[in-house]
A protein has these predicted regions:
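A general, composition-driven signal for non-globular sequence regions
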Residues: 12, 28, 242-244
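Surface-exposed extracytoplasmic segments
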Residues: 20-227
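A short, hydrophobic C-terminal helix/tail in secreted or cell-surface proteins
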Residues: 229-248
Length: 251
């Protein structure tokens, strides 16, 4: 009985640990950083800290922890944005594999040299104070075919150009995107939450997901890959105890 109770407890702890969100820490700079490193400009405005990913059924939830949360409606640097509304939230790009150029912090990685993003979650209003709805698109062709870059939003200032910011919804790019499912996004204090229905896609967190996100200036970009870890040591210990118990009963 004591062994059975111990095994149950260990398995419970193991499953609880694996149910925790998968975390991508921001170790990505990307090009072009113009010599600034991880963050161009004020870290108190643009720093991106980490992404946390979890999935229940077909719904992928991505939490982006960033100093930019809650600032898209502030009209930051509006004089340097083409529409005069300031810097907004970028769309979330996803792929089944991550193929950055070079090694960390990937200073030469950009829209040409890096990962070709397979999916994009397009926000309905990237300047909204609270959040809204979004649409998941399957993307084809190159990043230049399917995405808008920071330079499509900014001009006349130093920013991280060469980074994917948004799904290109223009008529010219129509052949490079296919609408799939929907989702929502919300602004929650120190982070943004994207809840995306993966129905119709080939994505699953169980198989690993790469992501790319940043504000529309690209002043800090987070990019990386999350996959389910190997069974934890507690789980392996529990399985070992189960095996030992079975062996004893057979003697």
């Amino acid at each position: 009985m004591k062994t059975t109770a111990l095994i149950t407890a260990l398995l419970s702890l193991s499953m609880t640990a694996q149910a925790d969100p998968l975390v991508i820490e921001d170790g990505y700079y990307g090009g072009d950083d113009h010599g600034y490193g991880d963050v161009i400009g004020n870290t108190g405005q643009f720093d991106v800290y980490r992404a946390e990913l979890s999935q229940v059924g077909s719904i992928l939830t991505v939490d982006i922890y960033t100093a930019f949360a809650g600032r898209a409606d502030d009209g930051l640097f509006s004089a340097y944005t083409y529409n005069g509304m300031g810097i907004g939230y970028g769309d979330l790009f996803l792929a089944s594999a991550w193929d950055p150029d070079g090694t960390a912090p990937y200073l030469d990685d950009d829209n040409v040299t890096g990962t070709v993003w397979e999916y994009g979650f397009s926000l309905d209003d990237r300047w909204d104070a609270n959040g809204g709805n979004g649409t998941l698109y399957a993307l084809t062709g190159s990043n230049d075919d399917s995405a808008l870059l920071a330079e499509d939003f900014m001009s006349g200032a130093i920013y991280r150009n060469g980074q994917e910011i948004a799904v290109d919804l223009s008529d010219e790019a129509a052949n490079f995107r296919s609408q799939l499912a929907g989702g929502t996004w919300t602004v929650n204090g120190d982070h943004l939450t994207f809840a995306i229905d993966l129905t119709g896609s080939d994505l699953s967190l169980a198989n690993g997901i790469a992501l790319h996100w940043g504000p529309s200036c690209g002043n800090d970009i987070i990019e990386g890959y999350a996959d389910v870890p190997e069974p934890g040591s507690l789980g392996l210990l529990a399985l070992g105890l189960i095996g030992a118990g079975v062996a004893r009963r057979r003697r």
